[in-house]
């Protein structure tokens, strides 16, 4: 195992993610995303990491996409802070990220949306994410409706669909060790660089 200390945390994360791609049965880029209402009520769900900008400033971060009218979208717009957790059981490793959240640009959202499978683009129009659904048939009816609407030509990005970038103030690396004497190293952003320290397990 490479050292956890005196590293660029983005580079270390990239190494771990690449290794997870060879050992995890599926979705090594899956991450738990925690959001919170302005009143302090948290919620948590799994999403997929779709990009990393490896800069130790406000322009860097971990990117994901979502329906802005979903619960997580609403919470992020009202309280733009989040935490992420990657857990790779096959490697006995975990990475936690904490920081403010900023919206991606329309150009970034358009480019990623255009790269998705056509059926997924139709689904983004059909799904009123996080709102009550009477039954599966209702969802399938909406899918058919939007598939017919966009039967010819490109499927545009819905105005309620975009992405966010979590700008890390904290990145913590955890590696399992025997007898629960695990390795924990936390990096904190400071200006254009990082400081790091070890934590008791």
Curated annotation (Swiss-Prot):
Cofactor(s), names only, from the UniProt record: FMN
Against InterPro entries, the record matches this protein to: Pyridox_Oxase, Pyridox_Oxase_CS, Pyridox_Oxase_N, Pyridoxamine_oxidase_dimer_C, Split_barrel_FMN-bd
Instruction: Name the top EC class.
Output: oxidoreductase
Record EC number: 1.4.3.5
Question: What reaction does this enzyme carry out catalytically?
Answer: pyridoxamine 5'-phosphate + O2 + H2O = pyridoxal 5'-phosphate + H2O2 + NH4(+); pyridoxine 5'-phosphate + O2 = pyridoxal 5'-phosphate + H2O2
**Binding sites annotated in the UniProt record for FMN:** 45-50, 65-66, 71-72, 94, 129-130, 174, 184
Pathway assigned in UniProt:
Cofactor metabolism; pyridoxal 5'-phosphate salvage; pyridoxal 5'-phosphate from pyridoxamine 5'-phosphate: step 1/1; Cofactor metabolism; pyridoxal 5'-phosphate salvage; pyridoxal 5'-phosphate from pyridoxine 5'-phosphate: step 1/1
Which keywords fit this entry according to its UniProt record?
Flavoprotein, FMN, Oxidoreductase, Pyridoxine biosynthesis
- Biological process GO annotation list? pyridoxine biosynthetic process
> Which residues are noted in the entry as substrate-binding?
50, 112, 116, 120, 180-182
Q: How is the co-factor bound, per the entry?
A: Binds 1 FMN per subunit.
Coiled coil region boundaries = none
GO MF annotation list: FMN binding; pyridoxamine phosphate oxidase activity
Q: Which PANTHER family match?
A: PYRIDOXINE-5'-PHOSPHATE OXIDASE (PTHR10851:SF0), PYRIDOXINE-5-PHOSPHATE OXIDASE (PTHR10851)
Q: What does this protein do?
A: Catalyzes the oxidation of either pyridoxine 5'-phosphate (PNP) or pyridoxamine 5'-phosphate (PMP) into pyridoxal 5'-phosphate (PLP).
- Quaternary arrangement and interactors, per the entry? Homodimer.
As for family, the record states: Belongs to the pyridoxamine 5'-phosphate oxidase family.
* Name of the protein: Pyridoxine/pyridoxamine 5'-phosphate oxidase
Lineage, opening ranks: Bacteria, Pseudomonadati, Pseudomonadota, Alphaproteobacteria, Rhodospirillales
């Amino acid at each position: 195992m490479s050292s956890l200390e005196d590293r660029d945390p983005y580079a270390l994360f990239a190494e771990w993610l690449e290794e997870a791609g060879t050992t995890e049965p599926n979705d090594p880029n899956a991450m738990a995303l925690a959001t919170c209402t302005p009143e302090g009520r948290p919620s948590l769900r799994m999403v997929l990491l779709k990009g990393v900008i490896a800069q130790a400033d406000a322009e860097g971060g971990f990117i994901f996409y979502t329906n802005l009218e979903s619960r997580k979208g609403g919470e992020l717009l009202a309280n733009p802070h989040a935490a992420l957790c990657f857990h790779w059981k096959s490697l006995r490793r975990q990475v936690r990220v904490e920081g403010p959240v900023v919206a991606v640009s329309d150009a970034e959202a358009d480019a990623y949306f255009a790269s998705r499978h056509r059926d997924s683009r139709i689904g983004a129009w059909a799904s009123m994410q996080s709102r009550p659904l009477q039954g599966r048939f209702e969802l399938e009816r909406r899918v058919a409706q939007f598939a017919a609407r966009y039967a010819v030509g490109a499927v545009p990005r819905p105005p309620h669909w975009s992405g966010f970038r979590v700008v890390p103030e904290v990145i913590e690396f955890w590696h399992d060790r025997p007898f629960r004497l695990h390795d924990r190293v936390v990096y904190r952003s400071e200006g254009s660089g990082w400081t790091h320290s070890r934590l008791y397990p």
